[in-house]
Amino acid sequence: MKIVAPPTLPIRPVAPIRAITPAARAIPGSGLPDEKGTSSLQVSRFAAALVQHSRILRERELIASRNALQSRAVKLGELYQLLMSTSDTGLDNAARLLRKKLLQDNDADLEQVLEFADGDAAKAHVVLQAARKQAEDDGAEEEYAALTQTLKHLRRRFGPRARAGINTARAFGRQNIDNKRRTALRNLYGVAVSGQPNVTGLIEALIGEQQEPGEFDLNLRDMRRAIADDLSAITPSASHEQLRTLMHGLTTARHVTTLLRGCEHLLGRMRKKNPKLTVDPPAFLKHMLTLTANGMNVNQTLQLTQHIGGNKLEHQLAFLNGLRADADATADPALAGPEKPPGRAE
């Protein structure tokens, strides 16, 4: 048996193993880059930039805060001027007088604040805010705390009335509105938004405020502007539905101006027939609105006829003939009571 040697396997050359040299690490303070390619000098510069940026941001925040406080103070002063008469000495002086009064009485009572503001919740709110800011700036901590509590009490008790006065300050603060008329309109508006909408009652009150011909139309216009401002405010004094109901009622009641002119003309003719007649047109129209809203009966018609026409039958008939057109005009659904705006279910 012949023995055969195994075949020779090919020998392949082996590549030599390279020696791995460790990377040189940056020595602190040498300025050489580290493993991430960032040198200590770059880190220092970045840290300094962060500090500078933070300082700039803080300065901007302080400036913005200071400007916001100044802007708020200016707006508070402007609001106070709209609420007060042109002869007033200013918000700062009013706030100091209020603080002096409360310190003398040793009691920051809400009733005293309202008395100082002539019973106006909006004025009291503005002056209290200014007085509290003065106390804070003066470092009077106890006075500041007392005024804060009084302000909270005012907001809880007269929140809607105060908000109504603030929201409508610009509408009622125009230069063509005298102080007496401004006060009357603001009081009427506060009453109108503090309860259920009563368009008839509001219109009758506006008629009663007329001192000279044409003033009712101006009052009606100013009241609509006030409602529009209140509706657009961030925090309205009443619900949007209630304010829209009042707006709709006042808008549809613009024809009352025509009714007033008709009453003036009718009463003017009747005074020639009945010299003892002393009824003025606003009072006569208010009476007619009340009668038509409740349903005018025979006895009421007879009493009114005798009162206006006098004792002579021909004068009474003349009054009834002149009254017919006015009575038909006053029978408007918008004057019969609270009404929902169009498109709303009863």
UniProtKB/Swiss-Prot annotation:
Involved in the secretion of a proteinaceous elicitor of the hypersensitivity response in plants. Also required for pathogenicity on host plant. This is Hypersensitivity response secretion protein HrpJ. Belongs to the HrpJ/YopN family. The lineage of its organism: Bacteria, Pseudomonadati, Pseudomonadota, Gammaproteobacteria, Pseudomonadales. InterPro entries: HrpJ-like, T3SS_LcrE, T3SS_TyeA-rel. It comes from the Bacteria. It comes from Pseudomonas syringae pv. syringae. Disulfide bonds: none annotated. Transmembrane segments: none annotated. The gene is hrpJ. Keywords: Hypersensitive response elicitation, Protein transport, Transport. NCBIfam families: LcrE, type_III_tyeA. The keyword Cell membrane does not apply. GO terms for biological process: negative regulation of protein secretion; protein secretion by the type III secretion system; symbiont-mediated perturbation of host programmed cell death. One of its GO terms (cellular component) is cell surface.
